[in-house]
Structures are given as C-alpha cells and as structure tokens.
C-alpha cells in the first residue's frame, strides 16, 4: 500500500485581477505561473520528478502489463501512458505505480469558466495528492515537493506551499508464516500461483496497527476491481466480488 500526502499550493502575482486588454501580455498571470510550477513536477515524458528525491526505483514483483493498465485505467484511444514515449524504452507501469512517488492534481482554482472575464488572474491555487511507495518517508517527500514548487514558480510570483497531511505506506513480508499460509490457501482456492503485486491505495490504520503490534502479521482483502472507479462519482462494487472472496 502506498503512503501519501495532501499538499496545498497558492500563487499570487497581482494585488487584483487587471484588464487583459490593457495589461495582458506583460502582467504575470497567476494561473499560468501555477501551471508552470506544477508542470515542472513531470519530465518531458510525463514521469514524476521532484528535486532531491529519487524517482527512478524499480519494482521487483509481478509486472503490470501496459495493455492491462490501459484497460484498467480506461485510457482514451490514443492517450499515452506516462513514460511510454521515452526513446530509451517505455518505463514499466509497475515502477511508476508501486515503486516511485506520484503526484496528481486533485483540485485547481482560479477564475471558474462559468465566470470567465477578460482579466489577468491575480491568484490561483491547487491541491496535489502525493503517493509514495511503502517504506518511503511521506512527510519528507511532501516537504521536498513544497520546496520544488517554491523553486520552480516563475516570474517572481509569490508562492505558498504547505503539507496538509501525510501518512505512511505499508508492506507485509510474504515470507512470514501467516502470510505464506494465506498465499498457499489462495493458490489452492483459485488454482493458480499467488503473485506479489502493489496495490496503490493508502490505509494509514495498517501502519498504526503494525507499530502497536510489531510481531503481528496483517493481511487485508479488497473486494473492488478497476471498474469500481473508487473515489469517482460512479463508484460501485459488484456484490458477486464479495461473494467470491468469501467463498
């Protein structure tokens, strides 16, 4: 399970929005400045980059085939997976979703489209969701993201970046007795070998339980699959998933 953090960032460039006909072109647009800062968190192929943070780790478990990911994530036709166009070779999906930090823009505020006016925006803000691999220091990486945003916000714009919350990731040792027995049971029940994969979601309670009971072995069952679109407007779970895992 990945760890993560919520990061808030605000950019201000003007005392007030000013007429785009009179000042546009020379007056610094706060929305553009924030876009530039956020864009600097990705390389030219879309992979996450953060100043001072290693974003090149390799996943050692089961691979995540690109076509399976494309279907699971419901990419539109022609849309590229991040890192796919690197001339040196496509970056494995598993590296990016299970072994490296990832940053998603989960909210962005400037002038709403429905209220658009011919004025240069004076302020813009965003919320970023950071995910980090299990074992990484989520708080430290979140601080590095804030430092990165401050360093890469252009045109002398005033920027405020802060970590709103952070939580650690979690990983279990599949070689321990209970986990190994669970793997054997799953192999017997489903008639196929058990593979080691990442999950991506964050459940901070697991880390707290492990800290409180360091010798305990923790296993979780998830009943959702990609089509459940967890956290979206159309989130759902197929009841047969619950029936099958219980069986």
Residue ranges and their predicted role:
Residues 87, 91-119, 129:
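A structural supersecondary motif
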Residues 5, 124-126:
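Hydrophobic core residues within well-ordered beta-strands of beta-rich domains
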Residues 14-16, 110-112, 131-135, 166, ...:
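Short, glycine-/Ser/Thr-/acidic-enriched flexible segments
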Residues 130-133, 159-175:
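A short beta-alpha structural unit
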Residues 1-85, 94-101, 212, 234-243:
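Fold-level recognition of mixed alpha/beta catalytic cores in primary-metabolism enzymes, strongest
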Residues 10, 34, 108, 120-124, ...:
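Zn-dependent metallopeptidase/amidohydrolase metal-coordination segment
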Residues 141-150:
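Short amphipathic alpha-helices in soluble, non-transmembrane regions
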Residues 169-188:
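Short, low-order "capping/linker" segments at domain edges
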């Amino acid at each position: 399970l990945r760890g993560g953090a919520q990061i808030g960032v605000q950019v201000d460039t003007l005392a007030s929005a000013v007429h785009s006909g009179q000042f546009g072109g020379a007056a610094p647009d706060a929305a553009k400045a924030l876009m530039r800062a956020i864009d600097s968190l990705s390389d030219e192929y879309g992979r996450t980059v953060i100043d001072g943070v290693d974003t090149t780790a390799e996943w050692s478990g089961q691979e995540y085939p690109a076509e399976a990911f494309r279907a699971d994530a419901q990419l539109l036709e022609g849309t590229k997976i991040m890192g796919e166009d690197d001339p040196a070779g496509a970056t494995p999906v598993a590296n990016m979703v299970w072994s490296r930090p990832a940053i998603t823009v989960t909210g962005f505020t400037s002038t709403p489209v429905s209220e658009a006016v011919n004025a240069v925006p004076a302020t813009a803000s965003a919320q970023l969701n950071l995910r980090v691999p299990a074992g990484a220091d989520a708080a430290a990486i979140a601080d590095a993201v804030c430092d990165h945003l401050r360093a890469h916000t252009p045109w002398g714009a005033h920027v405020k970046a802060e970590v709103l919350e952070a939580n650690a990731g979690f990983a279990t040792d599949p070689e321990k007795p209970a986990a190994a027995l669970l793997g054997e049971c799953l192999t017997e029940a489903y008639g196929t070998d058990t593979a080691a994969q990442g999950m991506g979601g964050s459940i901070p309670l697991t880390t707290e339980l492990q800290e409180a009971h360091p010798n305990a072995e923790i296993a979780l069952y998830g009943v959702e699959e990609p089509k459940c679109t967890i956290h979206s407007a159309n989130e759902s779970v197929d009841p047969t998933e619950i029936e099958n895992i219980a069986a």
